[in-house]
């Protein structure tokens, strides 16, 4: 499955199904095959550092040959996003407005959608990071991920609307000149800076949208366990992704019980079979990978090797 993988991959699904383990195993498999891999966690409940027993940050940390890992800190990412916005606004607005800019951003820090917007900026920068053959995202649970991946289209449209209003303002300025009025050069320079900033942001979001919706560039792998609730949530996630034109590469069914484990495990296997029948009725055409329920501790480097062999 993975050796023909797209350059950008997302692993997501219901909380607790093993997204981090599977995404890390995929990264190990590709790195061992000689590919340069960047593994990124966007889940606020980070676990990648625990697997490698390493302290990770927003900067790529080399953990193995061909494998670098990043854990995006939501609070730090939001603070950097707000700092960038403040720098841009201070450069474009008159000095008397600077205290108001600070007040507005302080209020915006905890507003709905701010965290998602900041994470989107970080993802948009990472998907184009040079030097890697594959960039793999270990995502937050389904609902957070669905909202995040729907944002590029919304943000591109929102920025486009701001640019249209900016153009209307510029037309008014040109009309004033035509009537013999004047427009201060500093104002015109600020207008040009605003246009340039909006254009850069729109291009960034459009670039991310183009990558996410290009099946040759990006695939999303849904991780689940063979249980009714994860199956139902995975079907909803599939609908959300495909409605946003994001290709689902596979369903990774994690922790599958053995068929020959005897009388004790037989009821568990029956529950799983029933859940997979439900999955078949909804997503029968999606490629599927089954990963067995392995003995021993799962969140270790040795466990990753065992899982990587099966991907």
Question: What are the functions of these language-model segments?
Answer:
Residues 1-3, 55, 181-184, 188-192, ...:
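C-terminal lobe/tail of nucleotide-utilizing enzymes
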Residues 1-9, 14-17, 22-203:
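Nucleotide-state-sensitive switch-loop elements of NTP-binding domains
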